[in-house]
């Protein structure tokens, strides 16, 4: 490929050669998720479809995303897999009566759950954008369906944030509001803007970032609250009794501090040089510094803890693979923006941790969860359901630095930087 700035520095072994090899290994692992009756199954620790797990909407979307990116990059021909996922979302997961997308479908075709989640719909938007860029049939229809549901039910013009959860008929809106759905909204909206150039997407992404970073994070000493009431008042004790929840954990989520740090800097590229956005770099650096200080080796053992309380004490000690992936991406982005070699030192250290402890050399992909002694566990994350975070960590340094992954791939293919 020859586009990795890291290789030009000669200061890390985790440059193009390593990243390309790992990306191809991850994609090969993910190919085992394809199932005959539509979409992608939930992979276990050995890369086999777990027949006890339903097909989850967000997993379908993440698979479309990773196959789509690597296909458009030319790393492999995955057009049939992208089409397979798009068809499943359109034909199986879409609610023909009430619109929107179900949360999960079991392997027999039965709907699972009684809600429609903003989290899922943001990933549908992201997948639809990437599939459209890949030229896959059915993708524009999927994009329109995702956009319609988001416009009608999830985007809140009063607070300029995304709603989180509706019932199946879109008649009752749950009072919970969350940061997680809005974080992935920023990712999807930025990708949609890069593809369509519709300012609606950019305006929404910037509004979400401003409220999240310049209000919620700043007003809480850069310890970003995750959970809110319907009027967007922080609920700091939410899930105190269920602290290791997969999507709504108690307290401060270390990986999300890193993820927001990266995302806001990527969005910031679209308003670079404009007045009034000084909070972007400030916020990104503050979030990163807090995640590093309180997350890495927080219990005197290598790796990042999952969560901490409001006194910066570890709560869930598990080492989630996605947290390390987001950490190396944030380090890379801040190094690209600032040129500060300390960020590259972090990048190298944390990739070394992934290389030694997280990558599964026997069965492939990455161990999704380790305990504080670095033993593989499945307390919060059974199996290895997707490669989304891991592949992103491999691809980001290989591509031109742009607001979204698909935008970067498009520019990469044009041969410009």
Predicted regions and their residues:
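Glycan-recognition and catalytic cores of secretory/periplasmic carbohydrate-active enzymes
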Residues: 1-417
């Amino acid at each position: 490929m020859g586009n990795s700035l890291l290789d030009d520095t000669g200061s890390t072994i985790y440059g193009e050669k390593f990243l390309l090899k790992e990306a191809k290994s991850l994609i090969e692992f993910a190919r085992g998720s394809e199932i005959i009756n539509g979409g992608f199954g939930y992979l276990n620790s050995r890369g086999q479809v777990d027949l006890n797990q339903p097909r989850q909407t967000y997993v379908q979307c993440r698979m479309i995303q990773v196959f789509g990116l690597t296909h458009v990059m030319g790393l492999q021909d995955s057009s049939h897999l992208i089409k397979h996922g798009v068809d499943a979302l359109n034909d199986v997961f879409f609610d023909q009566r009430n619109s929107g997308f179900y949360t999960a479908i079991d392997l027999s075709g039965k709907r699972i759950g009684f809600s429609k989640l903003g989290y899922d719909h943001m990933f549908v938007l992201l997948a639809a954008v990437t599939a459209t860029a890949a030229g896959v049939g059915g993708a524009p229809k999927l994009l329109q369906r995702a956009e319609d549901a988001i416009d009608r039910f999830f985007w809140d013009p009063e607070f300029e944030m995304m709603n989180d959860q509706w019932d199946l008929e879109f008649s009752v809106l749950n009072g919970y509001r969350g940061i997680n759905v809005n974080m992935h909204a920023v990712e999807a909206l930025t990708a949609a803007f890069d593809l369509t150039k519709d300012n609606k997407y950019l305006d929404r992404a910037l509004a979400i970032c401003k409220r999240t970073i310049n209000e919620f994070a700043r007003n809480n000493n850069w310890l970003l609250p995750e959970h809110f009431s319907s009027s967007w008042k922080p609920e700091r004790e939410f899930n105190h009794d269920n602290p290791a929840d997969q999507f709504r954990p108690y307290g401060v989520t270390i990986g999300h501090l890193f993820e927001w740090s990266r995302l806001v800097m990527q969005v910031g590229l679209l308003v670079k040089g404009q007045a009034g956005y000084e909070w972007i770099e400030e916020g990104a650096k503050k979030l990163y510094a807090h995640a590093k200080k309180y997350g890495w080796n927080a219990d005197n053992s290598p790796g990042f803890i999952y969560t901490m309380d409001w006194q910066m004490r570890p709560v869930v000690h598990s080492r989630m693979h996605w947290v390390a992936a987001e950490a190396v991406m944030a380090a890379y982005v801040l190094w690209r923006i600032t040129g500060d070699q300390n960020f590259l030192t972090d990048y190298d250290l944390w990739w070394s941790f992934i290389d030694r402890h997280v990558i599964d050399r026997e069965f492939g992909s990455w161990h999704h969860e380790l305990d504080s002694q670095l033993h593989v566990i499945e307390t919060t994350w059974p199996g290895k359901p997707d490669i989304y975070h891991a592949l992103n960590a491999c691809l980001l340094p290989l591509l031109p630095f742009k607001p979204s992954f698909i935008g970067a791939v498009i520019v990469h293919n044009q041969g410009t930087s």
